[in-house]
From Swiss-Prot:
Originating organism: Bos taurus (Bovine)
Predominant subcellular localization, coarse grouping: nucleus
One Pfam family named in its UniProt record: SHLD1_C
Keywords: Chromosome, DNA damage, DNA repair
Function: Component of the shieldin complex, which plays an important role in repair of DNA double-stranded breaks (DSBs). During G1 and S phase of the cell cycle, the complex functions downstream of TP53BP1 to promote non-homologous end joining (NHEJ) and suppress DNA end resection. Mediates various NHEJ-dependent processes including immunoglobulin class-switch recombination, and fusion of unprotected telomeres.
Subcellular location field: Chromosome
Subunit structure: Component of the shieldin complex, consisting of SHLD1, SHLD2, SHLD3 and MAD2L2/REV7. Within the complex, SHLD2 forms a scaffold which interacts with a SHLD3-MAD2L2 subcomplex via its N-terminus, and with SHLD1 via its C-terminus. Interacts with ASTE1.
Name of this chain's protein: Shieldin complex subunit 1
Polar residues bias locations: 1-15, 33-43, 60-69
Keyword DNA damage: yes
Recorded GO CC terms: site of double-strand break
GO biological process, one term: DNA repair
InterPro entries in UniProt: SHLD1, SHLD1_C
């Protein structure tokens, strides 16, 4: 009987020894667990880095970048013409200036057969002013205005001066008449040129 009683106890102890892990197994389990967690965290971080950002896949943001590039190109086209096309050469610019000077010289001289002393006086006055402006810098616009006025007076006559001259007795100033400021002048003829010629008293002997 004693033998039978001890046998179940020994079996129970053996069963308990088999169910519980040994100290060696527990130590390996504890040491391996942090390394597994580290590998898992590293894998998660790699996945996070490999996921594209929202701005990379957002079609609106790509369109915005394209529009910004197009805007930059357009602005640089205006500020830097050489980006899209070749700038004008100095030879072309000089050729254009010479052509304009030739045009103003040919059509600005009074007609020999006109016999109009007023047209001759106006042409001489304008020619003198043109020669003065040619020797001055930064007066290109004023020079072209006087040259164009000489061409217009030579082709159309000087009736505009006779109309607005207070010294012309056959063109008296009437009340309610149109003033120079309100009148629509010939295209290309500046009102400043009219005022300049009226101040020269060219009409006093006419």
């Amino acid at each position: 009987m004693a033998t039978q009683e001890t046998t179940p106890g020994s079996q129970t102890e053996e069963s308990n020894a088999l169910d519980l892990p040994s100290a060696y197994d527990i130590r390996d389990y504890v040491l391996q667990r942090p390394s597994q967690q580290t590998n898992s965290e590293a894998f998660s971080s790699e996945e996070a880095c490999s996921i594209p950002c929202s701005s990379d896949v957002d079609p609106d943001s790509s369109n915005l970048n394209t529009e910004q590039n197009d805007s930059w190109t357009s602005e640089n086209f205006w500020f830097y013409p050489s980006v899209k096309g070749q700038p004008e050469t100095k030879e072309e610019d000089d050729g254009l200036r010479k052509s304009l000077d030739k045009f103003y010289e040919v059509f600005g001289n009074p007609q020999p057969a006109s016999g109009n002393s007023l047209s001759t006086s106006v042409c001489q006055c304008l020619s003198q002013k043109i020669n003065e402006l040619k020797d001055q810098e930064n007066q290109t616009y004023t020079l072209r205005s006087f040259q164009m006025a000489r061409v217009i007076f030579n082709q159309n006559g000087c009736s505009i001066l006779q109309k607005h001259s207070r010294d012309a007795h056959f063109y008296p100033v009437r009340e309610g008449s149109t003033s120079l400021q309100d009148e629509k002048l010939t295209p290309g003829l500046s009102k400043d040129i009219i005022h300049f010629l009226l101040q020269q008293n060219l009409m006093k002997d006419q």
